[in-house]
Amino acid sequence: MMHLNPLVLVGAVIGVITALLVAAYAAVKDKKTAMGFERNMEDGEIMRRLARYARPYLSKFLIVGVLMLFSIAYDIISPLIVGRIEELVAGEFELRALFLGVSVYAGVLVFSMGSTYLQAVILQRVGQRIISDLREDLFSHIESLAHEQLNEIPVGKLVTRVTNDTNAISMTFTNLLVQLTKNSFVILGILVAMLCLNYELTLMVLCFVPFIVLFTVIFRKFSRRANRKLKNATTDINTYLSENLSGIKVTQIFGREDEKMEDFRKKSQKLARANQEQIFVFSVFRPLVYMLYVSSILCLFYLGGMGHLNNVSFLGQTISSGTIVTFYMYISKFFTPIQNLAEQFNWLQSALASAEKVFSIMDIQPRMQDAPDAIELDEVKGEIEFRDVWFSYVPGEWVLQGVSFHVDARQTVAFVGSTGSGKSTILSLICRNYEFQKGQILIDGIDIRKIRISSLRRHFGQMLQDVFLFSGTIRSNIVLREEGIPDSEIMEVCRYVNADKFINKLDHGLDEEVRERGNNFSAGQRQLLSFARTIIHKPSVMILDEATANIDTETELLIQDSLEKMRTVGTMLIVAHRLSTIQHADNIIVLSHGKILEQGTHQQLLARHGRYYQLYTLQYHKAQLNAAE
């Protein structure tokens, strides 16, 4: 029995470590939240949806499959060749036979390396194309969501879905699926080869498999937990950065840098801890598998060496030195894919979790959808009518209550009222940015719900108080990628809205760089560019929401002049903060708490001494006081 002492020692060490791992596993068994990988979508459904993106590249995957067979064959054949070479060297041999064996091994190795390289290149290219298709579909779907739906999802979360999560999915196509398949066949092929070579030594190796399975189950549990923590921490910090970098000027104005830094530090440390936990899990699992690998090698050398020295035969199979060398290589190639399988399966689960998050965004049904019988509008005169329209952002809290009015084609109508009266909401409903609950909104006598949304918005030009300019040039922001508009037409429109006065002073004119959100231009300049952007697309109805707010007097005069010119273009709807800009409107509608109080021309409303008269008087006296100062 003394000769079995080393094996007993190895078994005792493995047993103690296994007991400790089982105890750790049991400690979190009942903590459902510890798993953190619960999903609402089945793996099969996710894989089917991902397969739709892979289907156009099926021929490429077939080529990869053929190349994979060559690398699998190398893993199975190469140990046999090396074992044969060892037996040649151990005995009397001819140099020619040795040269032949080495040449065969070198040829198989080179062929395998070539096939592995081609396989990697094809997978990387195809994988990136698939993920590019997925990203484009995701971005297109996000663009189709209604305003209220976009308001419910943090921008940072959407950025994470389009970038981080799609990157995680790319691993599925570039590596995971092929490697999982390859490793499974390698394990099966090596097992068959070992059984054919020597039953006894193969059974010895198989004694370690239950421990590998147990370690893998435990590893999967803890690695899932670590992966989910890492994903959540990444999403949190991306959302925080997206919001706070956009509002960093407010932070500086109110001197809250230290408080924001403390918040960021907490989220950054949370992300660091999540990374550390994931690293720790892998740093424990890999040495454990390596311990089993080393233990099996020790057993091989011990049992195989004894069998070889004592010339022991088992079921008619002798243990030669070549057999020991072959098994040594097989054990290495057996344990490596097993370790990889465990890790790759976990990464696959992580990728599937990312895919579910992506598909959860893509499964959001746009609340604003075209009716089955929706029509295209080739031309719009600009007649608008509200019939008893009710609307609420939150159920039961009505923002508009039974609003009715009529706007004739090419008429200018202004909406005034205190904050929260529903002015901007009316303009948003006309463009179908939101869906109203009751009533009707008609364009040229047609219910807007019977018109295709894209067709409806094509005839509207909307200018907001907070003008958004994209990174690029002045030209690209005016034409918005519409091809074929010459510079002469762009400059003509700029002159029409008085934007040429500052554009001509710029070093590069229309090619002047526009930084993020147009921060290198003043509010008035951004507003004039917004006017030009609207006019150049020749809308039938123009909508201006607080277009003259927060600008200086000189720029206001330019904008008023532009407004007077724009009145001749088509129907114009204006939400005005400064009543001086709407005195020439054909009709002024005064709102309060979602209801129309009065309407009429500027002179008619002043003569009634109602709410409009009060607002105008307050602004007039305020303007006089400012002038006196």
Name these PLM-found stretches.
Residues D363, D370-A371, L377-E629:
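ABC-type nucleotide-binding domain
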Residues N151-G156, K229-E277, D373-I375:
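Loop segments that connect adjacent transmembrane helices in multi-pass transporters
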Residues A54, Q119, L123-Q124, H141-I187, ...:
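Juxtamembrane loop-to-helix connectors within ABC transporter transmembrane domains
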Residues A233, R256, F280, V289, ...:
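Cytosolic ends of transmembrane helices, especially the final helix of ABC transmembrane type-1 domains
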Residues M2-G11, S59-L80, R84, G101, ...:
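Alpha-helical segments in transporter systems
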Residues M1-N40, F61-S115, I122, C196-E200, ...:
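Transmembrane helix-loop-helix hairpins at lipid-water interfaces of multipass membrane proteins
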Residues I77-P79, G83, F111, L177-R220, ...:
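A hydrophobic transmembrane-helix motif
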